[in-house]
Every structure is written in structure tokens, then in C-alpha cells.
């Protein structure tokens, strides 16, 4: 059985980029296809990211950020309040850590994006951090394959790459978005993953590493939904939920402006509780009337001797993902939020979609 001490911390970045072609979609998201031989979510389309490494909080980063950006915050703004995201899963900065937790997680996401996709979210060391426009990814360096191999073998080499390019990780371009904890039973490997968002003016060149990642797609939120329903791609429930949440924004500028004007004071991290019904399953999320706060379901699922449709019909206050099949999810939502970030709208698949599944 997996316990709290066995959870692995991770960071992922949702890259939203402008689109040069005529299209009603205001932006597209980078989704990477994981290789089938991967232990966790084989074949899935995911946002770039990976596991936090000790190298991501190395004190050597301090001198690279200097002199323009100094500790402890390196210009990120006020430190977010520390509070447990879930009982038994409190993560504060390690005692004596050279970098704050949210800085290290950003470096992790940027490093993993380079490893998996060859995209460099860096900026010149002497550049100002403030910008009223989305960022631009750095062009891949000469010897991309060699550098990527070195970083994959030893994450400390990512700092060497940044020093070689006279750049720093563009931690200021990554905005807090939220986070997800792997629910019980999804996999023997469980992750505490911070979700970040980065807006880019244009789509950068993507070069999958052809090891962990074998392909990629740039898709608008609506396109990603359609590709999922048509079985062209597979999304895990958290990715599907976030794709639908991003549907709230009509354009890249609206999304970027929201990130600048509404920084999250306390980024939420959710643990879905899996409710097993007699004919399917439902992922219950915080705020749902059936969601149980506390650690009771950290290591087990809920179950009920009712059909999924009965549970859906009875629901009054809901925030849930109904899993009908691997390629058919529905979102039921009655909660309200003061901002676009809050929640996705309810989403039920069209009958034409269900007929072909």
C-alpha cells in the first residue's frame, strides 16, 4: 500500500501559445504523447513536466540568477501562505533550502520541458523579468541532442546549460494554476503535482526526445476534447478537467491578462476521491456534496451499490468527473466562482460521440 511518505513531488506546465493560422481558437496547448513503455500513463497525451530533483533547488542557482534577481524570492512576488493541501501531505520548503519551494518547482517544470520537448523556457540573465506580453521560447542550442542527453543523465547539467547560454530559467513566465494528487488505485506510483501555466506569443519548435515522448500535438481546448472523444488521443481525468477549464478563456491575451491580474493567493491542490458505482466510477472533487474531507480516502476508494446515472441524477451540489469509459468523461459542475479560473462548465458528450464509442 502506498503511504504519504511514498508520494513523489512533480511539476507540470501547460504551454498555451498563440496561433499564426486563421482560426476561431485563440490559443493552442502543447500535449506530448508518452511512449507506450512508460510505467505511468503509457500512451497518454500530457502537459510537459516531471519529478522534482534535488538539482532543482541547488544553491548554485543563486549565483546564476544574480545580480539582477536575488533571494529569497528572486522577484516572484510575495511568498504564498503555507498550508496543507491535504492532511498528511504538507510540503514546506526544506530547512535551509537555497531556493523557495515554488522557485524549485518552476525550475523543475522548465527542465523537464527541455528534456521531453526540446523547448527552452529561458531568458537572458540581464533581462528584466516584468513583461506585459507573453514570453518567447529560446531557440534550441547547438548540440541539442547532446545537451538533452546530459541533462537527462544528470539534472545538474541543466544549470550548466543555462550558464553556457548565459540565461536563467524564466520562472517569472510560469504562473500558479493549481495541482493534483494521484487518486488511490490509479497507479502504484502516486504523484503530488503542481500545475503551472505559461503563455507564449507563438508556438516554439518541438523536438520530442523519442524516448519518454514519441509525439506531440498543438490543440485548442475544444480540439483536444474532440480528439479525446474520437480516440485520437487519451487524456487522464485531471488533464481533461484542466483542458475544459481553459475553455473559459476566449483568447491568449485574455488568459495572459488573467494570470497577471489574478495571481492565486493559495494555489489549490486536489485529491480526487474515486467513487465506484455498480457500472462505472466517478471522481469526486472538493466542493462536491459527496466529497469527504480529511485523510479517510487517501488510501482507499468509496463504493456504492447504485448506477452512475442514479448518482448523477441525485446530485445537487457537485464538482465531479464521471468516467463512462476510457474515452468518455463528463464533468458535472454546480459550484460558482468569481473568476474564470474557478471551474470548468458542465460538460456532457454529444449523443453522436457516445454512439461511436
Swiss-Prot record:
Mg(2+) binds at residues 112, 116. This is Acyl-coenzyme A diphosphatase NUDT19. It comes from Rattus norvegicus (Rat). Belongs to the Nudix hydrolase family. One of its GO terms (biological process) is coenzyme A catabolic process. Keywords: Hydrolase, Magnesium, Manganese, Metal-binding, Peroxisome. The lineage of its organism: Eukaryota, Metazoa, Chordata, Craniata, Vertebrata. The record marks 34, 40, 189 as: Important for coenzyme A binding. One of its GO terms (molecular function) is coenzyme A diphosphatase activity. Monomer.
Amino acid at each position: 500500500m502506498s503511504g504519504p511518505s511514498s508520494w513523489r513531488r512533480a511539476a507540470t506546465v501547460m504551454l498555451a501559445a498563440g496561433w499564426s493560422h486563421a482560426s476561431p481558437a485563440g490559443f493552442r496547448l502543447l500535449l506530448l504523447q508518452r511512449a507506450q513503455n512508460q510505467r505511468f500513463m503509457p500512451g497518454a497525451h500530457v502537459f510537459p513536466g516531471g519529478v522534482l530533483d534535488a538539482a532543482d533547488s541547488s544553491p548554485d542557482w543563486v549565483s546564476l540568477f544574480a545580480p539582477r534577481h536575488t533571494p529569497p524570492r528572486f522577484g516572484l512576488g510575495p511568498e504564498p501562505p503555507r498550508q496543507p493541501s491535504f492532511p498528511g501531505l504538507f510540503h514546506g520548503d526544506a530547512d535551509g533550502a537555497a531556493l523557495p519551494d515554488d522557485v524549485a518547482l518552476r525550475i523543475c517544470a522548465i527542465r523537464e520541458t527541455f528534456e521531453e520537448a526540446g523547448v527552452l523556457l529561458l531568458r537572458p540573465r540581464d533581462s528584466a523579468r516584468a513583461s506585459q506580453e507573453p514570453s518567447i521560447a529560446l531557440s534550441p542550442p547547438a548540440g541539442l541532442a547532446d545537451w538533452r542527453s546530459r541533462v537527462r543523465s544528470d539534472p545538474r547539467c541543466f544549470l550548466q546549460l543555462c550558464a553556457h547560454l548565459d540565461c536563467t530559467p524564466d520562472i517569472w513566465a510560469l504562473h500558479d494554476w493549481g495541482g493534483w494528487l494521484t487518486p488511490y488505485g490509479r497507479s502504484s506510483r502516486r504523484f503530488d503535482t503542481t500545475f503551472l501555466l505559461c503563455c507564449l506569443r507563438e508556438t516554439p519548435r518541438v523536438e520530442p526526445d523519442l524516448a519518454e515522448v514519441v509525439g506531440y500535438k498543438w490543440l485548442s481546448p475544444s480540439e483536444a476534447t474532440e480528439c479525446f472523444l474520437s480516440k485520437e488521443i487519451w487524456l487522464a481525468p485531471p488533464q481533461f478537467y484542466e483542458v475544459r477549464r481553459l475553455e473559459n478563456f476566449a483568447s491568449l491575451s485574455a488568459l495572459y491578462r488573467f494570470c497577471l491580474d489574478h495571481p492565486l493567493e493559495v494555489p489549490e491542490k486536489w485529491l480526487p476521491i474515486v467513487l465506484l458505482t455498480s457500472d462505472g466510477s466517478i471522481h469526486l472533487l472538493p466542493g462536491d456534496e459527496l466529497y469527504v474531507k480529511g485523510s479517510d480516502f487517501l488510501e482507499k476508494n468509496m463504493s456504492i451499490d447504485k448506477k452512475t446515472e442514479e448518482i448523477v441524477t441525485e446530485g445537487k451540489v457537485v464538482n465531479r468527473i464521471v468516467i463512462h469509459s476510457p474515452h468518455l468523461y463528463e464533468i458535472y459542475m454546480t459550484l460558482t466562482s468569481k473568476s474564470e479560473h474557478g471551474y470548468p462548465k458542465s460538460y456532457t458528450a454529444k449523443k453522436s460521440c457516445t454512439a461511436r464509442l
